[in-house]
């Protein structure tokens, strides 16, 4: 292991990695020496967003990882389907012999701020968001826990959101905030469960991150108004989040577990 490749010899899984923050996570781990398997319901979903497509350096993130010089596997799978997710993990371990790092990034919201206020949000929207964020995270964690418990080592990182800790002014996105808050609490339960096996479990909670998908949305919402609540005065980048993921995936965080780390420029506490 070298300073430049602290993850050499490690095997990582990143869900929701076709674009945006998840892609940044996968590429950062590969640049630090890990072999990376990616899971996404559509590995070409970046094509739906002009800024995402413009930044791609291959047909998929799998090609980008291989271009870095690391091994890569790609799975088109839905994390709400436990069976296909378990099969993917079994294939990773079967081909590469182990699984050291799991980044449970897949998720996302649906609905407008107005229609997702707590008193009126419809069950159909709640079901979709809970499945994508909470259920998908649980499926991923349970799948990767099997080989990690056998190895008696591993690093699991879940992805929450500032929405899980901070209520928007209009009370919108209640279903998403509640699901992400549940992800954070589940992380702490899992940390307690897997601690005796030498597995750490932590959660990152991004704030306003300027991805190729979100940048136009944030601008339309009003940069000045949004950034007024961010002490650092700027939107975050996927690389800002990837740096924290790198820390939680490396031996620098061996005595950190059950932590919920905001990556939001101070938004949560403003």
Swiss-Prot record:
Residues at which NAD(+) binds: 19, 40, 78-79, 105, 176, 180, 209, 211
Temperature dependence: Rapidly inactivated at temperatures above 40 degrees Celsius.
Record-listed E.C. numbers: 1.1.1.245
Entry annotated with the keyword NAD: yes
Active-site residues, Swiss-Prot/TrEMBL: 176
Keywords: Cytoplasm, NAD, Oxidoreductase
Induction profile: Induced by cyclohexanol.
Pfam families: adh_short_C2 (PF13561)
A single MF term (Gene Ontology): oxidoreductase activity, acting on the CH-OH group of donors, NAD or NADP as acceptor
Activity regulation annotation text: Activity is enhanced by the addition of Ba(2+) and Mg(2+), but inhibited by the addition of Al(3+), Ca(2+), Co(2+), Cu(2+), Mn(2+) and Zn(2+).
A cellular component term, taken from the record's GO annotations: cytoplasm
Catalytic activity as recorded in UniProt: cyclohexanol + NAD(+) = cyclohexanone + NADH + H(+)
Organism superkingdom: Bacteria
pH-activity relationship: Optimum pH is 8.0. Stable between pH 7.5 and 8.5.
Subcellular location: Cytoplasm
S-S bridge residues: none
Biological function: Catalyzes the oxidation of cyclohexanol to cyclohexanone. Can also use a broad range of other alcohols, including trans-cyclohexane-1,2-diol, trans-cyclopentane-1,2-diol, cyclopentanol, hexane-1,2-diol, ethanol, 1-propanol, 1-butanol, 1-pentanol and 1-hexanol.
Quaternary structure and interacting proteins, as annotated: Homodimer.
Protein family (similarity comment): Belongs to the short-chain dehydrogenases/reductases (SDR) family.
Protein name: Cyclohexanol dehydrogenase
